[in-house]
From Swiss-Prot:
This is NADH dehydrogenase [ubiquinone] 1 beta subcomplex subunit 10. The lineage of its organism: Eukaryota, Metazoa, Ecdysozoa, Arthropoda, Hexapoda. It comes from Bombyx mori (Silk moth). It is a peripheral membrane protein. GO terms for cellular component: mitochondrial inner membrane; respiratory chain complex I. Belongs to the complex I NDUFB10 subunit family. Keywords: Electron transport, Membrane, Mitochondrion, Mitochondrion inner membrane, Respiratory chain, Transport.
Length: 159
């Protein structure tokens, strides 16, 4: 008897082991393919939502794990914000190429959205450098808030 495209097995012991295996495996495989898999939600791995972890201001000074999680969350947020900014820039560039003679008027709304998002990104992540982490960003935010309390707002986004 040929199973799964393999030639028949001449060894009696292996044939017995395969028969025993198939008596257990066949009902399990049938149940999984006919009952479990059709009722499962198809959820791609790239749509995974991560839970929010405590921010750096909620961590204790000696809590290394909380610091690590806050930095990982900060890096994820920076990557998402950078990708949003890149998408807005690409939309503006596409509009500019498509509407070439009057792109200044037709793409103005995209330009305003991009500049607003760029300003918000720079307020949060600008001047941190390549090795900026959550604690440095928190200190930057704290110093900016102190400066604005003394001298007034720097931007329309921080009023």
């Amino acid at each position: 008897m040929v199973q799964d495209g393999n030639p028949p097995d001449d060894n009696v012991f292996r044939a017995f082991c395969n028969a025993l295996y198939n008596t257990v495996d066949a009902p399990v495989t049938w149940f999984r393919e006919t009952v479990v898999e059709p009722n499962q939600k198809k959820y791609p791995w790239y749509h995974q939502n991560y839970r929010r972890v405590p921010t750096i201001d909620q961590c204790y000074d000696d809590d290394v794990v909380c610091d690590f999680e806050a930095n990982a969350q900060f890096k994820r947020d920076r990557a998402v914000d950078s990708e949003i900014l890149s998408i807005l820039r690409q939309r503006y560039e596409d509009c500019m190429m498509y509407e070439q003679p009057d792109h200044a008027t037709k793409c103005r709304s995209l330009w305003d959205k991009y500049k607003s998002a760029e300003e918000a990104w720079f307020i949060k992540y600008g001047d941190l450098g390549a090795y900026g982490d959550a604690r440095k960003a928190y200190m930057k935010q704290k110093h900016r808030m102190v400066w604005e309390r003394r001298n007034g707002p720097l931007s329309d986004l921080t009023k």
